[in-house]
Amino acid sequence: WIMGTFDQVHGLAGWQWLFLLEAIPSVLLGLLTFKMLPNHFSQAKWLSDEEKAIIDKNLKKDLDGNSDAKGKSSFKDGFFNLNILKLGAINFSMLLCTYSMGFWLPTFVKSTGVSNLLHIGLLVAIPSIIGLVAMLLIGRSSDKYRERRWHLVLPFVFGSIALFLTQMFSTDIVMTLVLFSIAAIATTGTIPVFFSLPATFLSGTAAATGFALACSIANLAGLVSNTLVGYAIQLTGKPEGALMVFAVCWVFSCLILLSLPK
């Protein structure tokens, strides 16, 4: 709707207005978060003293029950840690798929025959909504069963299969959305579970350092994702060819996950 309505308003293309208008809520929310979000749960005004005590007790219980994390709490433990590098590689794959799907999904939808910009925008929102719902369900299941690895491996496996199958249904809008929705579960739905992994074998400063390092490695995906997609499309001659690269990335991510401590 934005691209169609605001195209050439004040000399700007519709896609330029899209970036400008969609950026405003993010910027405002960032400023609001910086001002209102406390640094520690003990500073949260919306929590009662009893609730703060429960949170503190649960955090200490998690740390005491995690034998792998004991004694590994320094900056050095978090920075020079092979498992953290593995997490960085996994997160790199996750972001690579997330960025590429986010930027190129409209192209894949358009290739099925949908041409109206508003319709494309509404359709590409479906996988994101499903990924959001999956995020809540997968996170709840992971906490319920106190299990992390297989709550990541299984979505990655199904996501990889879905991306492989996209080539067979490149002109079918329904199957395209179904397959991309499965892929969205693997990218978006697994985020909370993934970011709970550093605390399973690190604690304190080491966990924070490891978290930051894994994110820094992963953010390199933003630099290479579009270039990689463009090169893959040029090489294969069709947009779906780029998805094979991401499917392979998820396969390697599964292997790396299975090598991490339980």
Predicted regions and their residues:
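Small-residue (Gly/Pro/Ala) motifs that create kinks and tight helix-helix packing interfaces
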Residues: 2-4, 29, 33, 106, ...
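A membrane-interface helix-boundary motif in multi-pass transporters
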Residues: 5-23, 230-249
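Central mid-sequence intracellular linker of multi-pass
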Residues: 11-75, 259-262
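Helix-to-loop junctions at the C-terminal end of transmembrane segments
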Residues: 134-147, 233-234
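C-terminal transmembrane helical hairpin of 12-TM major facilitator-type secondary transporters
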Residues: 146-197
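A late C-terminal transmembrane helix in Major Facilitator Superfamily
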Residues: 201-238, 246
